[in-house]
Amino acid sequence: MKWSEISIHTTHEAVEAISNILHEAGAGGVVIEDPYDLVKDRDDWYGEIVELNPDDYPEEGVVIKAYLPVNSFLGETVEQIKQAINNLWLYDIDLGKNKITLSEVNEEEWATAWKKHYHPVKVSEKFTIVPTWETYEPASNDELIIEMDPGMAFGTGTHPTTVMCLQALEKYVHPGDNVIDVGTGSGILSIAAAMLGAHSVRALDLDPVAIDSARLNVKLNKVQHVVTVAQNNLLDHIDEQADVIVANILAEIILRFTADAYRLLKPGGRFITSGIIQAKKQDVKDGLLAAGFFIEEVNVMEDWVAFVAIKP
């Protein structure tokens, strides 16, 4: 089988949105080539187990590569991807160069092209994310291993916004808690909450691709007895109270349901949010305060912001 590699030269700000567009288009594996990875302080990420080749990275911006099967629908699929990316300006997302190129690769090249970019990553005091094909021995009995397959939608969960959410969950989820994960994507945050001892976790997403991905990952990590994956639009028609609500999605989407999050949280409950670029930081802060929240933490990693807000 032949594959077409689609390469998009863009900005840090656009990475997550474009990655989701590619996965929704049926991409088999997505690679993010970010030159910041070559120079970032590894201590910030608890020691990443990686081997990086500078020749694989652009001098500026970010290159996202994905692999699409070569078939009669390829041209139409590529045009849909281009249109969806161009529409991101409606959300004030800077696309940078927005240069899109195509090249053909064979099955063998595709099978290894993106795997070389993924290795075990320790993202917090407890959590290490491990690709399914890697053999990894925990450094201690307290280390929690989340297995992820980057071939599934939404990657391995090592994006800064995901890392900050994982770190916040580790701090604020307690045994017996009820947790709601809005816009679950791969399900990684729901899996983490379950591993931390949550009594029940609701993993919600409107995208059927995300639902399938989350269910597969939940089963892979053997937490299906705790995590319920369901298709739902944000917090619409959700009534049960939660100790923690987490959402790693665009700032504009977060602002649509801050009032619902406040309504569903128990007193003292926390709303953990990320997916927020620096330019949207004040907008989200204002929205949280207007809903009645107290801002407990504001964390920053690279160009991204995460809030921990508490319901008094």
UniProtKB/Swiss-Prot annotation:
S-adenosyl-L-methionine binds at T162, G183, D205, N248. One of its GO terms (biological process) is methylation. Belongs to the methyltransferase superfamily. PrmA family. GO terms for cellular component: cytoplasm. It comes from Geobacillus thermodenitrificans (strain NG80-2). This is Ribosomal protein L11 methyltransferase. Keywords: Cytoplasm, Methyltransferase, S-adenosyl-L-methionine, Transferase. Coiled coil: none annotated. Its EC number is 2.1.1.-. The keyword RNA-binding does not apply. It is an enzyme of class 2 (transferase). HAMAP family: Methyltr_PrmA. Pfam families: PrmA. Its main location: cytoplasm. It catalyses: L-lysyl-[protein] + 3 S-adenosyl-L-methionine = N(6),N(6),N(6)-trimethyl-L-lysyl-[protein] + 3 S-adenosyl-L-homocysteine + 3 H(+). It is found in: Cytoplasm. Gene3D superfamilies: Vaccinia Virus protein VP39. The lineage of its organism: Bacteria, Bacillati, Bacillota, Bacilli, Bacillales. GO terms for molecular function: protein-lysine N-methyltransferase activity. Methylates ribosomal protein L11.
